[in-house]
């Protein structure tokens, strides 16, 4: 019987999500009405029969640690195996993880104690459904030393991924991380299977190389391929999304509201599990109207909701209109509000008669590289005062208070941050 250990890299900042990851790690970002991003990778593990999982955390880990806890929602609260949180070792000569490969290197003793045949290395911030047995079976069939899951991406997106070229037998003959000019459109998903003894040797060598960035895509994998190792590409044909930008995060959530969504959250044979607060069923008042939307438990809806994802415990007041938006847990939207093309984070208070997301297209003044999709983003714990008008592609930072608003109107592309 093969022994597989999964290692989930969950220490990422997710800077391209802007204020959504200012206080939490990217894998802890809410998604799909009740989940957090890491839930999809954890659920894929247990649905694939993998019950020995290490989660490597670093950036703002507290909420993520509390969310995973002992792993009970995923049936990972086990005496043998189960889930283990693996923060950086800050004593002795070690320190913060200096790259994806270094993160695994710092946990060599943990992996050795599990004595696996194969190590499955995963990212904790992607949304997808995958039976990992498929890639492991492929890996064994090919007699591979390492296998990388991949998909074909549009040519204009190749500079966001590790890009590989293969021979007719799917063996990888060239690999380049985020090339400016790609010779292929076959992109790595950041999902790897390695024979453990083989990988361990390369991790030790990489750690001794002072010129290395200690990253799988930049250093480890290119070295393996250049030295003629048996590294293969496993083509994945299912749903997979990198929700690393505000626009892709917003789009991927709203995809779930389609009549036939690309990711089926309701598949009884492939459930996604999460740790959530117990809440009563949603209530939709006689004054409410809901069209093509996800409404989670604990919500109270008195207004109009269309093409939106509404998380747990959200309150939407009478005559309020919410369209094409993502509204996260325990946010309150007052009466007579109009919210369009927005992402509103957790525990925000939007007072009465507020308009969000309407206006002309405009370049964002805070960070035009991060806020590019004409989506208005409201950070967690903020309060939007009555009568405010917030335009398109605006940003309201984390914890913004009424006193931070110097005027009722925030022009498209502008921003408001909390002043200490």
From Swiss-Prot:
Pathway as given in its UniProt record: Glycan biosynthesis; glycogen biosynthesis
Looking up InterPro entries in the UniProt record yields: ADP-Glc_PPase, ADP_Glu_pyroP_CS, GlgC_bac, GlmU/GlgC-like_hexapep, NTP_transferase_dom, Nucleotide-diphossugar_trans, Trimer_LpxA-like_sf
Q: Which Gene3D superfamilies match?
A: Hexapeptide repeat proteins (2.160.10.10), Spore Coat Polysaccharide Biosynthesis Protein SpsA, Chain A (3.90.550.10)
Chain's role: Involved in the biosynthesis of ADP-glucose, a building block required for the elongation reactions to produce glycogen. Catalyzes the reaction between ATP and alpha-D-glucose 1-phosphate (G1P) to produce pyrophosphate and ADP-Glc.
Q: From the Swiss-Prot or TrEMBL record, what is one GO molecular function term? A: glucose-1-phosphate adenylyltransferase activity
Protein's name in the database:
Glucose-1-phosphate adenylyltransferase
Q: What organism, scientifically named, is this protein from?
A: Pseudothermotoga lettingae (strain ATCC BAA-301 / DSM 14385 / NBRC 107922 / TMO) (Thermotoga lettingae)
* Superkingdom per UniProt: Bacteria
Q: Which family does it belong to?
A: Belongs to the bacterial/plant glucose-1-phosphate adenylyltransferase family.
> What positions does the entry give for alpha-D-glucose 1-phosphate binding?
97, 162, 177-178, 188
Quaternary assembly: Homotetramer.
Keywords, A to Z, come to:
ATP-binding, Carbohydrate metabolism, Glycogen biosynthesis, Glycogen metabolism, Nucleotide-binding, Nucleotidyltransferase, Transferase
* EC number(s) given by UniProt: 2.7.7.27
Catalytic activity line of the entry: alpha-D-glucose 1-phosphate + ATP + H(+) = ADP-alpha-D-glucose + diphosphate
> Which gene does this sequence derive from?
glgC
Give GO BP annotations, semicolon-separated: glycogen biosynthetic process
EC primary class: transferase
Would the keyword ATP-binding turn up in this protein's UniProt record?
yes
């Amino acid at each position: 019987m093969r022994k597989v250990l999964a290692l989930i890299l969950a220490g990422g900042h997710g800077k391209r999500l802007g204020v959504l990851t200012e206080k939490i790690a990217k894998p802890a970002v809410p998604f799909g009405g009740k989940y957090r991003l890491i839930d999809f990778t954890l659920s894929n593990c247990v649905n694939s029969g993998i019950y020995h999982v290490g989660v490597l955390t670093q950036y703002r880990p507290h909420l993520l640690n509390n969310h995973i806890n002992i792993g009970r929602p995923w049936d990972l609260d086990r005496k043998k195996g189960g889930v283990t949180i693996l923060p950086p070792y800050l004593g002795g000569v070690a320190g913060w993880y200096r790259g994806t490969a270094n993160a695994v290197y710092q946990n060599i003793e943990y992996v050795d104690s599990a004595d696996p045949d194969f190590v499955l290395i995963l990212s904790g911030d992607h949304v997808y459904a995958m039976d990992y047995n498929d890639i492991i079976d492929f890996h064994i069939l090919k007699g591979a030393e390492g296998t990388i899951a991949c998909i074909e991406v549009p040519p204009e997106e190749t500079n966001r991924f590790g890009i590989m070229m293969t021979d007719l037998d799917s063996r990888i003959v060239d690999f380049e991380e985020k090339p400016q000019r790609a010779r292929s459109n076959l992109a790595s998903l950041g999902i790897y299977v390695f024979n453990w003894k083989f990988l361990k040797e390369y991790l030790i060598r990489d750690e001794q190389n002072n010129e290395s960035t200690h990253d799988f895509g930049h250093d480890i994998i290119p070295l393996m391929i250049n030295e003629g190792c048996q590294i293969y590409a496993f083509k994945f044909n299912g749903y997979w999304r990198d929700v690393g930008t505000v626009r892709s995060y917003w789009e991927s959530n709203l995809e779930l509201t389609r009549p036939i969504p690309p990711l089926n959250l309701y598949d009884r044979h492939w459930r996604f599990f999460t740790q959530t607060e117990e809440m009563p069923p949603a209530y939709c008042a006689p004054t409410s109207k809901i069209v093509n939307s996800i409404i989670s438990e604990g919500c109270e809806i008195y207004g109009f909701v269309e093409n939106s994802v509404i998380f747990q415990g959200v309150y939407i007041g009478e005559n309020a209109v919410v369209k094409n938006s993502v509204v996260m847990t325990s946010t309150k939207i007052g009466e007579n509000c109009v919210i369009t093309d927005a992402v509103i984070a957790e525990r925000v208070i939007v007072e009465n008669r507020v308009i969000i997301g309407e206006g002309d297209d405009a370049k964002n003044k805070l960070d035009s590289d991060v806020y590019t999709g004409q989506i208005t983003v409201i950070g967690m714990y903020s309060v939007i005062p009555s009568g405010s008008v917030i335009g398109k592609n605006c940003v309201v930072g984390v914890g913004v208070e009424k006193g931070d608003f110097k005027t009722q109107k925030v022009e498209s592309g502008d921003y408001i941050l909390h002043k200490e």
